[in-house]
Amino acid sequence: ASCLVGSEMCIRDRGRAIPFVDEGDGPVKLVLIQEQGLAADVLGVAAHYLAEEAGFHVLRIGHRSESEATLDERVEDAIAVIDHVGIEDTWVGGHGFGGTIARALVSAHSDRANGLLLLGVEDVDIAVAPAIPVLIVQGTEDTDTPAANAEALQATIPDRSSIKTIAGDHLFPMHHPIETGVIIEEYLDWD
């Protein structure tokens, strides 16, 4: 069932409300999972750019209100929204902890993903699914998800991962949304 949280749509699934924003209808599809615990919509402008200017179909997924959910439950939340919207053949990505959820989702459901997009990389031990390309966008001054994490991940899959940098801290997607969007657009829409 659909519901409304502020100005965002949400779905109610097994008693939890999961907010999301669905924009655009282009052939290139991208699921973006928000960082946790930020009041601001850090990915909003970059996602809007991708939907309006690049012609992508972008699904942004937030977090249920209770913060005690496990990583697996958060993956289930994202899958529930993806299924509700009906997106297939998509890149899956996220910012900070949202990227960790995306990594876990793609690791467990690699058949549902065309690629993995990480806006900052948390230091977690989650294997990247075989044959999945990975784009990492890294803030040069990011101390929450430092460049060393991105470099360590890339070292495990050098043949199918790329790191692009943006001047800025952990909130680079909000402070430099168009630059973030252009990097994503050029990588995902190269063909």
Whereabouts are the PLM-identified features?
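Short beta-strand/loop motif that positions the catalytic acidic residue
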Residues: 130, 136-138, 142
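Single conserved hydrophobic/aromatic residue that forms the stacking wall/gate
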Residues: 1-11
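A conserved short beta-strand
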Residues: 111-123
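Catalytic histidine-centered segment of alpha/beta-hydrolase-like enzymes
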Residues: 168-177
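Conserved acidic catalytic loop of the alpha/beta-hydrolase fold
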Residues: 75-90
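Conserved HGGG/HGGXW glycine-rich cap/lid loop of the alpha/beta-hydrolase fold
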Residues: 19-66
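Short alpha-helix in the alpha/beta-hydrolase fold that links the catalytic acid
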Residues: 146-154
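Gly/Ala-rich beta-loop-alpha elbow adjacent to hydrolase catalytic centers
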Residues: 94-98, 102
